[in-house]
Amino acid sequence: LSQNKQKLAEKPMAAVAVGFGHQGGKRKTSEAVYITEEQTRTEIKDTRISVSITKTATVDSYTNAELRKKYHIDKYDLHPGYVFPESVRSLIPRNTPEYVDKGFNYVERIVRALYYFKQCALIGPSGTGKTHIVYLIAELCGLPIWEINCGLQTSAYDLFGRYIGLGKENWIDGQIVMWCRNGGILYLDEANMMKQDIASRLNPVLDTRGHIVLTEKDNEIVHRHPHGYLVISMNPFSAEFVGTKPLNAALRRRMSVWINFDYLSVGDKIFPDEVELIAKRSGIDKNTAEKIVRTGAELRRQYKNGDLPYGPSPGDLINWATLIADGCTPIEAAVETIVGTTSDDVEVQAVVKRIVESVFSSS
């Protein structure tokens, strides 16, 4: 005896989640989940009875819809009419905090570049939110993200795939090949640290050919998914970033759009929204928040001039402010946060501490 039953139902359930980002933020999202289909199957064989229930749900995040309007990306649908397979939906980011910029419309510009050209490049110093914004875009556009750090230890086998065990029976796809097959955003972080052999193998998939040849797998040709997008990010090529080198010329030509990132506040230029951000997310008063931002701006200036190895991100400043809100003095909190974050070198830490003391000793 075999019985199959299908029924349609809608059952809303509320869910609240919290996420964190490079700007130290956390965003609560209120989501409505609707059960759109329920399948029940009952089988009786001999004296055994088995029952299986399969439920399919769709999630509608009101917060994300509002953010799409806020960032002016409603008109750019990066996967029209296409639903990503269940196997990769877990790679779609959730609860990514909003991104605060200086009116440069980074989100809109990146989404527009992906919509028209399918790939773009982000360049800027550490702590300016390049990775944060890519994750935010992936969430707002409903795209799985495949992140690869292009360090010198990353091998072609990790990215394209390899056989495991003896013989040629068990092949495992690498990250890039899985992206080609499934779509989404391939995010190559620290792209100007990429090995030359890896960069050259990417060229065919980024131009009109649109495919990768797996020489390790009997020259199998894997075509790029129609909803496969590429974002590369990098720090500026300089001596401070060990391992960086000028980006491969062929790869550079295939990046249709280049977007430059910078810190919110640098030197004497203090961005009021960053002060508001620090005060709001840590709970400290605006006067203390302004001093924290001024300290961060000076550290960033010295970093950009090559005098310090790191410039603090807004998230670093919020960590500092959070300890102050908990009762630590500004100096104590700085020693536990941005002083240690900047460098392990005792002399460099002393320089950072002096900058903190000079800002907080002023009226």
PLM feature spans:
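C-terminal regulatory/interaction module of P-loop NTP-utilizing enzymes
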Residues: 2-363
